[in-house]
Amino acid sequence: MKIIAYGIRDDEKPYLDEWVTKNHIEVKAVPDLLDSSNIDLAKDYDGVVAYQQKPYTADLFDKMHEFGIHAFSLRNVGLDNVPADALKKNDIKISNVPAYSPRAIAELSVTQLLALLRKIPEFEYKMAHGDYRWEPDIGLELNQMTVGVIGTGRIGRAAIDIFKPFGAKVIAYDVFRNPALEKEGMYVDTLEELYQQANVITLHVPALKDNYHMLDEKAFGQMQDGTFILNFARGTLVDTPALLKALDSGKVAGAALDTYENEVGIFDVDHGDQPIDDPVFNDLMSRRNVMITPHAAFYTRPAVKNMVQIALDNNRDLIEKNSSKNEVKFE
């Protein structure tokens, strides 16, 4: 058995080597992301492992089928950049890593919220320019807030577990309710109720056709003045121009974003001194009440180890058993 893994970073390599030593399976590590220029490297391999934000194009799976490869494993959760029709057409099974470290993402979302509540970006800016006064940048306390969690899967529940000890009131919305949270009476029946009651809204749902721009101008209009928005899920959940308008009006007091709807080509790139040709993104970056991280909420040592080794486990199982506990089946 031979596996080829694309987009392997230096920080992933030790965990890949550890897995190879333990499993006695050959794995070729390719540093470049998977695309049409390097798919031919997969010839003579039994499975492909990958992780990237840019789209996987249909021709890649045609090539895999041509090479006799029927096992494709992602080192991440999201499948929104994978063409399901191409997988079905080429009889390729796909797996993901549904939970590599929910706490990593939840912890950063809470960290960024605390920084916004206490005006940390504002103080950093002022002090860098010689202004050491605390006024007028008075902060807020999380124990006085109502946090609305949209999506109560692994990450959403981890976020709830962190918010509650701070003394925040937590309410939640999910189409699929968690029985334990329901017993606590945490759920509201509609998103509108959550928008109206919460002054912090945090997103922890996958990107689907039905939730594209779920936070749009109408949704922002239903929120309290001075609401804080956290998006550590998928960029397409937020209508960014509508968010900018809500920030301008004061409807939104601040936003912490680990994702952006047009992030491909912006995040995970060293731009140096070159300007980014995206006026909407540049507007976000110019605001001291907006904190942006480059889709890095997952990026902890435990998470990276899990992403690499669980993906390789999945790929091995797809090759050996034609199935994996983390196989994703499209309808």
Curated annotation (Swiss-Prot):
Its EC number is 1.1.1.28, 1.1.1.29. It catalyses: (R)-lactate + NAD(+) = pyruvate + NADH + H(+); (R)-glycerate + NAD(+) = 3-hydroxypyruvate + NADH + H(+). Pfam families: 2-Hacid_dh, 2-Hacid_dh_C. It is an enzyme of class 1 (oxidoreductase). It comes from the Bacteria. SUPFAM superfamilies: Formate/glycerate dehydrogenase catalytic domain-like, NAD(P)-binding Rossmann-fold domains. InterPro entries: D-isomer_2_OHA_DH_cat_dom, D-isomer_DH_CS, D-isomer_DH_CS1, D-isomer_DH_NAD-bd, NAD(P)-bd_dom_sf. Keywords: NAD, Oxidoreductase. Coiled coil: none annotated. NAD(+) binds at residues 154-155, 174, 205-206, 211, 232-234, 258. The keyword NAD applies. The keyword NAD applies. Homodimer. PANTHER family: 2-HYDROXYACID DEHYDROGENASE HOMOLOG 1-RELATED. Has both D-lactate and D-glycerate dehydrogenase activities. Equally active on pyruvate and hydroxypyruvate. Belongs to the D-isomer specific 2-hydroxyacid dehydrogenase family. This is D-lactate/D-glycerate dehydrogenase. The lineage of its organism: Bacteria, Bacillati, Bacillota, Bacilli, Lactobacillales.
